Regions:
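Interfacial transmembrane-helix termini
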Residues: 2-7, 21-40, 55-66, 73-95, ...
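Loop-to-helix entry and N-terminal half of a specific, functionally important transmembrane alpha helix
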Residues: 291-329, 335
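Hydrophobic alpha-helical transmembrane segments
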Residues: 41-45, 91-98, 265-287
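Hydrophobic, glycine- and aromatic-enriched re-entrant/interface helices and adjoining loop segments
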Residues: 135, 192, 196-197, 202-277, ...
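A juxtamembrane structural motif centered on a specific transmembrane helix
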Residues: 1-5, 20-26, 317-374
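Interfacial loop-to-transmembrane-helix boundary motif in multi-pass membrane proteins
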Residues: 59-67, 84-92, 102-126, 161-166, ...
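Central hydrophobic cores of alpha-helical transmembrane segments in multi-pass inner-membrane proteins
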Residues: 22, 39-52, 69-77, 92-106, ...
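Hydrophobic alpha-helical segments of polytopic membrane proteins
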Residues: 155-222
Length: 374
């Protein structure tokens, strides 16, 4: 316990100091007071959240630290944006924190019930229908997928396999009709694996696999020449990134059209970018541990769904970056500037914290009942 407390104290001191240095120095070099203040705000907020008791916001320290570091890497790239783009990015990450708290409270408070299954399904399908709305130029697909993960987990834990499969296929159909092939691929694979882990039945696992593959095959036959949705960005070539950090970093601010991961690679090197993505392994391992230790089937399946989402998105990004997957893949998790995507990622990361809090509450209840039995 003493070693764990000492390690927590070192992390609490090291992370804010590290990001204070790497964020404030570029702001001073560019001579921008606004960018300097934005760079200073992130370490201060991070220090405050690390010092507050974790039970206050149901925060899980390991997963929150991994999320905070990945967000910090996004801010490191955001320092080189224009002032307006940097301000927009800072507000997006602030909104991510709010959705992270919302996800933690949701996973801590909700159990598998008809409400926790039907309401997220309806709202998620509504968000996935965004490409059919008039005047909407951004994608809400990841927010819809996050809600469908919540809904399908509730259905599977209640052994309502038919509604779970119906919600899965409805979401997949909307993604395919919206021509968001990478998101459809991510959701299809995650849903099939959830059925395999949550149903405990080979028949339902096989049925989900067959129906998902049939939908993909039907979409390819009906839309053989369709292009991905304009809301899904194509990946720039990694050839513009140096292997290591350049001796003279670029000081001119970007207009904001380049993705954050590309700016991060240009300023600090592709090796640093790949090492930063390795931090996603910490989040995935912690999420898998929380899912395996969950006392309820709902929280176990939900934790597995979050791990599949973040792991699948990272894998799609790496495959597309290396040219092995001929698709316009999404950007890596948390290191991006899209406000709807950051909100969805914050909500999903918060679910892991809520599952951790739920596990601790269940263990405390078991200990109390054990004491009463004596």
């Amino acid at each position: 316990m003493k070693k764990q407390s000492s390690l927590r104290g070192r992390v609490t001191v090291f992370l804010p100091l590290f990001f204070a240095l790497v964020l404030i120095l570029p702001g001073l070099e560019n001579g921008s007071y606004a960018r300097w203040m934005l760079a200073l705000s992130f370490p201060c907020v991070l220090l405050l959240l690390l010092l507050l008791p974790s039970r206050l916001f149901f925060l899980d320290r390991p997963s929150f630290s991994a999320v905070a570091v990945l967000c910090g890497f996004g801010m490191m790239a955001g320092v080189y944006l224009s002032e307006d783009a940097a301000l927009s990015l800072a507000l997006s990450y602030a909104l991510l924190l709010l959705f992270l708290f919302a996800g933690a409270v949701s996973a801590r408070s909700f159990r598998a019930s008809p409400f926790s299954a039907v309401f997220p399904a309806a709202l998620g399908l509504f968000l996935l229908s965004g490409p059919f709305w008039t005047g909407v130029s951004f994608s809400l697909a990841e927010g819809g997928i996050a809600l469908l993960l919540f809904s399908v987990s509730a259905f599977l834990s209640r052994r309502n396999y038919v509604p779970a499969l119906g919600v899965t296929l409805a979401g997949l159909l909307l993604l395919l009709l919206g021509k968001d092939i990478p998101s459809a691929l991510l959701w299809g694979i995650a849903a099939v694996l959830l059925f395999w882990a949550g149903s405990g039945s080979g028949l339902w696992s096989l049925l989900s696999l067959v129906t998902v593959c049939a939908l993909f095959a039907g979409a390819m036959l009906l839309f053989p020449s369709s292009e991905p949705s304009p809301s899904v960005p194509s990946l720039p070539s990694p050839a513009s990134m140096p292997l290591l950090a350049p001796e003279v970093p670029q000081s001119s601010p970007s207009s904001g059209s380049d993705p954050l991961w590309l700016l991060l690679g240009r300023q600090y090197g592709s090796v640093f970018l790949l090492l930063s993505l390795l931090l996603m392994l910490v989040l995935l391992i912690r999420g898998a541990s929380l899912a395996l230790n969950a006392r309820s089937a709902f929280h176990g399946i939900l934790g597995l769904g979050v791990v599949l989402f973040f792991g699948g998105r990272t894998l799609l990004f790496l495959l597309s970056l290396s040219g092995l997957l001929p698709l316009a893949s999404p950007e890596p998790p948390l290191i991006l500037s899209s406000l709807p995507s950051l909100a969805a990622h914050g909500f999903l990361a918060g679910l892991l914290s809520g599952i951790s809090a739920r596990n601790e509450a269940d263990l405390a209840e078991d200990a109390r009942l054990s004491m009463l039995a004596r």
